[in-house]
From Swiss-Prot:
It is an enzyme of class 2 (transferase). One of its GO terms (biological process) is positive regulation of Rho guanyl-nucleotide exchange factor activity. This is Ephrin type-A receptor 4. The modification Phosphotyrosine is found at Y596, Y602, Y779, Y928. Pfam families: EphA2_TM (PF14575), Ephrin_lbd (PF01404), Ephrin_rec_like (PF07699), fn3 (PF00041), PK_Tyr_Ser-Thr (PF07714), SAM_2 (PF07647). Residues 911-975 form the SAM domain. PANTHER family: EPH RECEPTOR A5, EPHRIN TYPE-A RECEPTOR 4. The gene is EPHA4. Receptor tyrosine kinase which binds membrane-bound ephrin family ligands residing on adjacent cells, leading to contact-dependent bidirectional signaling into neighboring cells. The signaling pathway downstream of the receptor is referred to as forward signaling while the signaling pathway downstream of the ephrin ligand is referred to as reverse signaling. Highly promiscuous, it has the unique property among Eph receptors to bind and to be physiologically activated by both GPI-anchored ephrin-A and transmembrane ephrin-B ligands including EFNA1 and EFNB3. Expressed at high levels in brain, with expression also detected in the kidney, lung, muscle and thymus. GO terms for molecular function: ATP binding; DH domain binding; GPI-linked ephrin receptor activity; protein kinase activity; transmembrane-ephrin receptor activity. Keywords: ATP-binding, Cell adhesion, Cell membrane, Developmental protein, Endosome, Glycoprotein, Kinase, Membrane, Neurogenesis, Nucleotide-binding, Phosphoprotein, Receptor, Repeat, Signal, Transferase, Transmembrane, Transmembrane helix, Tyrosine-protein kinase. Residues 1-19 form the signal peptide. It comes from Gallus gallus (Chicken). Residues 621-882 form the Protein kinase domain.
């Protein structure tokens, strides 16, 4: 070192080294990339020039640990340019690094004769590189970071006094992008010693905030940048809001956002989620601590989410986990009864122990017990009424009415709360036994007219529901409707029927009936109105002259012959005779023909069930398996064994629990309807179960299920005769219903059931008469939705359901049967179906469908309902086809499957057109004449082979026009194949 001996600096450097090696603990947010004090052995940095510039000096500290330093002190010579370069320093992902330099510098004023050449600064450079083996210093590659000046410099006196003047400077550089970099120190004439060089970058260290752990994160490239970091929840916790923090450029975490919550059964302790201790619990993921188990409960495991109730205590379903466990209440106290004829009033006091709950209510159980045999009791049944209600009472009194006279009753009053069902016990009830007094009979529910003539009405009625003793006699009160009870007559009878004679013809009379026992008369029934006839009925009785009888019979025969002849003549004029009166307006009853009675006309629907359906003891029924689910409950198969009869298989419809009175009434209405029918092609009602739960409807069991599914499952397996036989059975059943003036309204293959002998039976009689306005034309009813595709046009437009609309539906069923269960109108929407039918389109014949059957379908689909055949005519026609199988051999299509285009009855006769132009003009599609000509379709023989793709290819894209053309094409094709006649004479 020119001008200043190196030895003069060594004592001072030893002191300095002792100071800098005392501690090497750095902040947690700093990651060291290079620390010259930690290098074992020589640093081996490259100096330029190799000699006369920077020198590496090794000095021992007080622990005899070598400290490697670099010195330079060429203060005597001008124009110094001494470079010192570090080894390659890996970046390790840092975008900004910091250089900490500890150094000493000689005061130029303390050196004589160097004022022109001595400097008190040096320069710091860096160079980014992916090459860690560069051997030479290329000054032009380096970029200057800063000029470094000393805050304090030392003199010769300081050396003598061993005064330490160590400088520390920190500089940063970035952003960095390559794998590593080199640092360089340029001396321009200073007397300097580099004691240590440390290169580091800053990070935000791993930390836990709000139960979220944030990993070590390197700071951003700029001194003001913030790095967003998403945290992860610690063990046994879950996110409430997404946990985030920002890592600042100084390595400090800023702005915590979001947090995690300890899972159920865990609480926050010392920044962790630790399990709840024994005897504590936590039910939800919240930020609260574990809570001690509420009264009458405990936990025996760490991490409990709830506490177990003590023996005899319970928790209701809606009770929070924080609520104490409770128990059922004790029995009500001080039960008092007051009997008034066939009514009883009960009052009681609240139980002594409410079980720790406030939701106390009361249930009353009524039992009818035999005299002297209190242990032989049975439920009072549904005929007894409770006011305000039987169960869920909030008051401590109840009135019970409609009891039987002179009968022993036991009433139990149960106190219940939210946990009673977990441990029901007789300890929760108090009972009282009473005997009712004598009482008058209850009102009669129903009066029927068995026969009405010009001057008389034959009445019959059932015994009152509660006779309350022996009925001594009945009293009938009647009067003309117009008199409004101002003038009435009384007739008394000991039987439950009577003939009221001497009435005026064509007059409405109102009748009331009441019963009398030893306790007196009961109330009159409600009014029942009947109207006498205008024409006298023929009477043939004892003493009638045989000659007169013979003449009457002969006259009747002649009259029948005349009527038949008139019908034949009329039949020749019209295919089917038009009805003189709409079917739904025919109200007169033919003598000897049973007529359907609508159960909804009964004031008490239960009376209709009792009248038309047989009550079956539930013990006679064995349910075997569930075969389906209906609107009201499950449908099961099972067996019925009635005493004295053989066991049979049955289908069982059940009414699901929790039903309303309306649901029960609607459910049983189907039984009231079915019970009136007796025909081999109508599903047979075996009976009902109404006196216990579940309420059930029992019908015969049909092994093959619904007709549509059965046909799809057996596609193509039946002969045409077999299919026609099925249709004949359905038609026969519908004729029977029509003769009884019953309109089905929902005739479809899905509502026809098939037994093991392929006998088809009409079912599903639960359909409502109430239809909603629905723009989608799918009317909602109590029995489900009626698709438009089965419904006659007048029923859609005017809600006019008649036997004629059932005939339309029967035609659709015929199509379903012959197509083996295909969906009518395929995937067309309801609105498209309505529009197509209105425009005169009809379904084409299914594959291999005989012409005669398709013609019968088209007859059923006549727009005018009076033009449609009656069910009797349909059955006769099917009988003729069955007797003449050859008539079923001619089919309307030779294709493997029918076209999905509807048939248009307005299609022209093939024989009436001779060219494509004539044909297009006939169907009003002449606008497409050029399209056909350009595509080469110049003859009708070529046209009849076209399909929908062909039409689209020649430029006909409108769906309605495609359908119209294709329907006419199909009709022409059929005419060619059949040799005569049109296929769709609608």
């Amino acid at each position: 070192m020119a001008g200043v001996p190196v030895g003069a600096l060594l004592p001072l450097l030893v002191g300095v080294c002792g100071a800098v090696t005392g501690s090497r603990v750095y902040p947690a947010n700093e990651v060291t990339l290079l620390d010259s004090r930690s290098v074992q052995g020589e640093l081996g940095w490259i100096a330029s020039p190799l000699e006369g510039g920077w020198e590496e000096v090794s000095i021992m500290d007080e622990k005899n640990t070598p400290i490697r330093t670099y010195q330079v002190c060429n203060v005597m010579e001008p124009s110094q340019n001494n470079w010192l370069r570090t080894d390659w320093i890996p970046r390790e992902g840092a975008q900004r690094v910091y250089i900490e330099i500890k150094f000493t510098l000689r005061d130029c004023n303390s050196l004589p004769g160097v004022m022109g050449t001595c400097k008190e600064t040096f320069n710091l450079y860096y160079y980014e590189s992916n090459n860690d083996k560069e051997r030479f210093i290329r000054e032009s590659q380096f970029a200057k970071i800063d000029t470094i000046a000393a805050d304090e410099s030392f003199t010769q006196v300081d050396i003598g006094d061993r005064i330490m003047k160590l400088n520390t400077e920190v500089r940063d550089v970035g952003p960095l992008s390559k794998k590593g970099f080199y640092l360089a120190f340029q001396d321009v004439g200073a007397c300097i010693a580099l004691v240590s060089v440390r290169v580091f970058y800053k990070k935000c260290p791993l930390t836990v905030r709000n139960l979220a752990q944030f990993p070590d994160t390197i700071t951003g490239a700029d001194t003001s940048s913030l790095v967003e970091v998403r945290g992860s929840c610690v063990n046994n916790s879950e996110e409430k809001d997404v946990p985030k923090m920002y890592c600042g450029a100084d390595g400090e975490w800023l702005v915590p956002i979001g947090n995690c919550l300890c899972n159920a059964g865990y609480e926050e302790r010392n920044g962790e989620c630790q399990a709840c201790k024994i005897g504590y619990y936590k039910a939800l993921s919240t930020d609260v601590a574990c809570a001690k188990c509420p009264p009458h409960s405990y936990s025996i495991w760490e991490g409990s989410t709830s506490c177990t109730c003590d023996r005899g205590f319970f928790r209701a379903e809606n009770d929070a986990a924080s609520m104490p466990c409770t128990r059922p209440p004790s029995a009500p106290q001080n039960l008092i009864s007051n009997v008034n004829e066939t009514s009883v009033n009960l009052e009681w006091s609240a139980p002594q122990n409410k079980g720790g709950r406030d939701d106390i209510s009361y249930n009353v159980v009524c039992k009818r017990c035999g005299a002297g045999e209190p242990s032989h009791c049975r439920s009072c049944g549904s005929g007894v009424h409770f006011s305000p209600q039987q169960n869920g009472l909030k008051t401590t009194k109840v009135s019970i009415t409609d009891l039987l006279a002179h009968t022993n009753y036991t009433f139990e009053v149960w106190a219940v709360n939210g946990v009673s069902k977990h441990n029901p016990s007789q300890d929760q009830a108090v009972s009282v036994t009473v005997t009712t007094n004598q009482a008058a009979p209850s009102p009669i529910a129903l009066i029927q007219a068995k026969e009405i003539t010009r001057h008389s009405v034959a009445l019959a009625w059932l015994e009152p529901d509660r006779p309350n003793g022996v009925i001594l006699e009945y009293e009938v009160k009647y009067y003309e409707k117009d008199q409004n009870e101002r003038s009435y007559r009384i007739v008394k009878t000991a039987s439950r029927n009577t003939d009221i004679k001497g009435l005026n013809p064509l007059t409405s009379y109102v009748f009331h009936v009441r019963a009398r026992t030893a306790a007196g008369y009961g109330d009159f029934s409600g009014p029942f109105e009947f109207t006498t006839n205008t024409v006298p009925s023929p009477i043939i009785g004892d003493g009638t002259n045989p000659t007169v009888l013979l003449v009457s019979v002969a006259g009747s025969v002649v009259l029948v012959v005349i009527l038949i002849a008139a019908f034949v003549i009329s039949r020749r004029r019209s295919k089917y005779s038009k009805a003189k009166q709409e079917a739904d307006e025919e109200k007169h009853l033919n003598q000897g023909v049973r007529t359907y009675v609508d159960p909804f006309t009964y004031e008490d629907p239960n009376q209709a069930v009792r009248e038309f359906a047989k009550e079956i003891d539930a013990s006679c029924i064995k349910i075997e398996k569930v075969i389906g689910v209906g609107e009201f409950g499950e449908v099961c198969s099972g067996r019925l064994k009635v005493p004295g009869k053989r066991e049979i298989c049955v289908a069982i419809k059940t009414l699901k629990a929790g039903y309303t009175d309306k649901q029960r009434r609607d459910f049983l209405s189907e039984a009231s309807i079915m019970g009136q029918f007796d025909h081999p092609n109508i599903i047979h009602l075996e009976g009902v179960v109404t006196k216990c739960k579940p309420v059930m409807i029992i019908t015969e069991y049909m092994e093959n299920g619904s007709l549509d599914a059965f046909l799809r499952k057996n596609d193509g397996r039946f002969t045409v005769i077999q299919l026609v036989g099925m249709l004949r059975g359905i038609g026969s059943g519908m004729k029977y219903l029509s003769d009884m003036s019953y309109v089905h309204r929902d005739l479809a293959a899905r509502n026809i059931l098939v037994n093991s002998n392929l006998v088809c039976k009409v079912s599903d009689f639960g359909m409502s008469r109430v239809l909603e306005d629905d723009p989608e034309a799918a009317y909602t009813t109590r029995g489900g939705k009626i698709p438009i595709r089965w419904t006659a046009p007048e029923a859609i437009a005017y809600r006019k359901f008649t036997s004629a609309s059932d005939v339309w539906s029967y035609g659709i069923v015929m199509w379903e049967v012959m197509s083996y269960g295909e969906r009518p109108y395929w995937d067309m929407s309801n609105q498209d179906v309505i529009k197509a039918i209105e425009e005169g389109y009809r379904l084409p014949p299914p594959m291999d469908c005989p012409i005669a059957l398709h013609q019968l379908m088209l007859d059923c689909w006549q727009k005018e309902r009076s033009d449609r055949p009656k069910f009797g005519q349909i059955v006769n026609m099917l009988d003729k086809l069955i007797r003449n199988p050859n008539s079923l051999k001619r089919t309307g299509s030779e294709s493997s499957r029918p076209s999905t285009a509807l048939l248009d009855p307005s299609s022209p006769e093939f024989s009436a057109v001779v060219s494509v132009s004539d044909w297009l003009q006939a169907i009003k599609m002449e606008r497409y004449k050029d399209n056909f000509t350009a595509a080469g379709y110049t003859t009708l023989e070529a046209v009849v082979h076209m399909n929908q793709d062909d039409l689209a290819r020649i430029g006909i894209t409108a769906i309605t026009h495609q359908n119209k053309i294709l329907s006419s094409v199909q009709a022409m094709r059929s005419q060619m194949q059949q040799m005569h006649g049109r296929m769709v004479p609608v």
